[in-house]
């Protein structure tokens, strides 16, 4: 069996999958926030419970809101204080007596989609999350590309370029501070939160993303104008990723991925932002939704 964990700041979810990545069982518990020992023991208890339930010793994959440096084994998980700057892989392997693998949760999302039967034909899959933040993961031949420090795919912490700033008003463009310490990171613009902040600052009215989209479909001209601008901003930013990575398919997840107009408008806007010889990759909506993280974590032990 394949055990996949989604490690969040408020909850830890375990899901058990068979070798075909079909879910057999799942359980959620609260995330211990202060005690590292309690955090480790929570995961260990869930693993042992699954072992007993399925009469096997399953593989253990973790999806975390951060990364583990491959060189040092130290986790960087700033919103889970109990496990931040701790050797989580080594300590879990010692307690469980088996190999443990961990990846950023956006990488796990992308890996889950890459292992879908419809996407398995593609050698490269770029997963992008337009949710609370903007993140991504790159999959080559069914494997996560993590980079030398585990930080590959942190597309949300690249910054707006010249064309994006001009689109947003040049010297008058809204510039947002990012939690990483930089300014004008894509995380603060292409996320659901960024969508709302941009509308507020450019249209002078604070609305939820859902309300903005409802106005767009109702034909409200301020919403229509804003959405077209946002699509162009996505085309500039995602176009840069396509130029560098040249993926076969892009899968979108997160709350804004439910905005169906994206799949109509973005492919039309992208060619103007790419080299003439480039192909616009297939852009599609994620299939697994909230289950993508645990499913991708379980897939960390699969290979083509």
Curated annotation (Swiss-Prot):
Pathway as given in its UniProt record: Cell wall biogenesis; peptidoglycan recycling
An example Gene Ontology biological process: peptidoglycan turnover
Pfam family, one: ROK
UniProt key word RNA-binding: no
Residues given in the record as ATP binding sites: 4-11, 133-140
Catalysed transformations (reactions): N-acetyl-D-glucosamine + ATP = N-acetyl-D-glucosamine 6-phosphate + ADP + H(+)
Listed GO MF terms: ATP binding; N-acetylglucosamine kinase activity; zinc ion binding
Covalent S-S links between cysteines: none
InterPro entries from the UniProt entry: ATPase_NBD (IPR043129), N-acetyl-D-glucosamine_kinase (IPR023505), ROK (IPR000600), ROK_cs (IPR049874)
Enzyme Commission code: 2.7.1.59
Enzyme superclass (EC): transferase
Keywords: ATP-binding, Carbohydrate metabolism, Kinase, Metal-binding, Nucleotide-binding, Transferase, Zinc
Gene3D superfamilies named among the record's database cross-references: 3.30.420.40
Binding residue positions for Zn(2+): 157, 178, 180, 185
Entry similarity comment: Belongs to the ROK (NagC/XylR) family. NagK subfamily.
Role description: Catalyzes the phosphorylation of N-acetyl-D-glucosamine (GlcNAc) derived from cell-wall degradation, yielding GlcNAc-6-P.
Protein name per UniProt: N-acetyl-D-glucosamine kinase
Source species: Pasteurella multocida (strain Pm70)
Gene: nagK
């Amino acid at each position: 069996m394949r055990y996949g964990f989604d490690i969040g700041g408020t909850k830890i979810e375990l899901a058990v999958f068979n070798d075909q990545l079909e879910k057999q069982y799942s359980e959620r518990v609260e995330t211990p926030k202060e005690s590292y020992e309690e955090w480790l023991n929570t995961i260990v208890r869930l693993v042992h419970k699954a072992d007993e339930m399925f009469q096997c010793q399953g593989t253990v994959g973790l999806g975390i809101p951060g990364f583990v440096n491959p060189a040092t084994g130290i986790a960087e998980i700033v919103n889970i204080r109990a496990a931040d700057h701790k050797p989580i892989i080594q300590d879990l392997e010692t307690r469980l007596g088996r190999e443990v693998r961990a990846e950023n949760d956006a990488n796990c999302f992308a890996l889950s989609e890459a292992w879908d039967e419809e996407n398995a034909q593609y050698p490269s899959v770029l997963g992008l999350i337009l949710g609370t933040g903007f993140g991504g993961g790159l999959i080559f031949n069914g494997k996560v590309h993590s980079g030398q420090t585990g930080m590959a795919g942190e597309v949300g912490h690249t910054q707006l370029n010249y064309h994006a700033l001009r689109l947003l008003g040049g010297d008058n463009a809204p510039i947002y501070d990012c939690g990483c310490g930089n300014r004008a990171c894509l995380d603060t613009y292409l996320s659901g939160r960024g969508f709302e902040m941009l509308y507020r600052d450019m249209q002078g009215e604070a609305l939820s993303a859902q309300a903005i989209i409802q106005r767009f479909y109702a034909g409200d001209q301020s919403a229509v104008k804003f959405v077209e601008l946002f699509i162009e901003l996505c085309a500039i930013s995602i176009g840069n990723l396509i130029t560098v990575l040249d993926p076969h398919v892009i899968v979108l997840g997160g709350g804004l991925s439910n905005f169906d107009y994206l799949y109509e408008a973005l492919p039309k806007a992208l060619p103007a932002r790419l080299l003439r010889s480039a192909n616009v990759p297939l852009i599609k909506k994620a299939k697994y939704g909230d289950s993508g993280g645990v499913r991708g974590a379980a897939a960390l032990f699969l290979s083509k």
